[in-house]
Amino acid sequence: MEDVKWLLKKYGFLIVLMVIIVVIISIILGKRSSEKNVEKVWEPPVEIPFSNENEIRSNNIAEENIEESETESESDTESSLWFLPKAENCLLTKAEKSRLKDTAMVAAEQLKDVYKDIELEEGVSYGSNIREFTKEQRREAVSLLGNAGFVSVTEDTNMENHEEIENFYAAYMENRDAMVTIYEVNRDGLIGAVTFIYRDNRLQTYYVGIGWQGGGIPEIKDTLVSDIAEINLTEKGYFIYAYENPIAHSSLRQYWRVKPLSDKCRELTAKYVYGLSYVNYNVLVTNWDSNNVEDILMPCMFEDIYRIYTGEILSTENWRIPADIYEKIMTTCFPVSIEQLREKCGYDEDSNSYEYEMIFASPYPPFGEVVDYTENPDGTTTLVVDGVWADYNSDCAFTNTIVVQPFDDGTFRYLSNLIEQKELEVPKGGR
């Protein structure tokens, strides 16, 4: 006992410290052992099987995939027409839209021979990407569509079966539901099937764009629904319409000439009127003849006159035009003298050249079309020209009477112009 007391007295503190250490170590080891035991006995919760769960999940995924596929398909179809106005909802049912697309493909099948030898190239998604599509091919396509009973049109060509548009417009004016589809053959060969719908006092268009694969195989490239703000079929025969939301950087209104125009009037328009401006200079907006021809002379007019005379785009050097070229063309095309030209059109004696003044495009300009003509005994021709200003809903804004003198070499001279205001004010012209 004494030995124990002595031991405790001499080493008591050390013994107590060792006991404390042992206890602490035991606690720590016990905690770790407990954690290990918990980890060993823990099992993931048991899943209670539900007999239809996989089936329902599979169906949901399938439905989502279908919806995504339809959305992607519709998005892909319309993506190339992102710049055009779109309606939030369509007046047509899905079945009606499907029938219109089927009919468009039937119409396209009529044209396989026209497109069978086309060459395709890389290009924009909204174009046909046909390397070359001629005016003759466009006219043949319009004729074939017309013979098959479709309303069809292309630039500078009379519309086929135009009576259908007249019937549609008559129904619209009587507040009767109606539809009509126009097949437009564009310059690049793309065909736009535009269906106008009047229903529930609303106007819309449903557009189906038809492109072409090699060998003349048609395909639907685009579809689009757009709200229409107004339509107008003029007495002279222009179908003019406006989108509810106008196309950015485009005309205020779109149009087709519905009633036919004679080939001779189209020929005279192309030769004498096409390319002349009502807004950039005074040739068409001033009453003039040989006595006051100086009133229409200004440098900016030469670019258009050069193109009409030569069929080419004017190119200049240092913004000057050689005097011999300028004076030859202007004295041929107008009853003017060289002296008058040099006084009015920016002639520079040192360089023997004329100033080139660039024409900047004006928004929404009118254009002229020959609607009548008279071949006079003296060899001149009198043209009756209507100013068409579709952007302001007019196909006869003003009327020009232009006298021209054709020459044996194919050139001609403008001799005079008279303009009469009709539905709209005459533009101011150049400065």
Regions found by a protein language model. Name each.
Residues 36-431:
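Mature, Sec-exported extracytoplasmic domains of Gram-positive
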Residues 27-39:
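Hydrophobic single-pass membrane-insertion segments
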Residues 7-8, 29-30, 55:
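Intrinsically disordered, low-complexity sequence elements enriched in Ser/Thr/Gly/Pro
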